């Protein structure tokens, strides 16, 4: 039981470090849905949204 909890904790820590930074902030000003082309150029995926006047992209 102790060994399995150590393994579970290790997997949790590793997954947090790998997937913890799941958004890419840009310094490009935006309005509404104008972030698709910015995100496509920045990370290759058109998934993003305008937050506080700046584009935030999600890989």
Swiss-Prot record:
Gene3D superfamilies: Knottin, scorpion toxin-like. It is found in: Secreted. Keywords: Disulfide bond, Ion channel impairing toxin, Neurotoxin, Potassium channel impairing toxin, Pyrrolidone carboxylic acid, Secreted, Signal, Toxin, Voltage-gated potassium channel impairing toxin. It comes from Olivierus martensii (Manchurian scorpion). The record marks 49 as: Basic residue of the functional dyad. GO terms for molecular function: ion channel inhibitor activity; potassium channel regulator activity; toxin activity. The modification Pyrrolidone carboxylic acid is found at residue 23. It holds the Pfam family Toxin_2. Negative results: has no effect on Kv1.1/KCNA1, Kv1.2/KCNA2, Kv1.3/KCNA3, Kv7.1/KCNQ1, Kv7.1/KCNQ1+minK, and on Kir2.1/KCNJ2. The record marks 58 as: Aromatic residue of the functional dyad. One of its GO terms (cellular component) is extracellular region. Belongs to the short scorpion toxin superfamily. Potassium channel inhibitor family. Alpha-KTx 15 subfamily. Disulfide bonds join 30-50, 35-55, 39-57. This is Potassium channel toxin alpha-KTx 15.2. Expressed by the venom gland. Has the structural arrangement of an alpha-helix connected to a beta-sheet by disulfide bonds (CSalpha/beta). Residues 1-22 form the signal peptide.
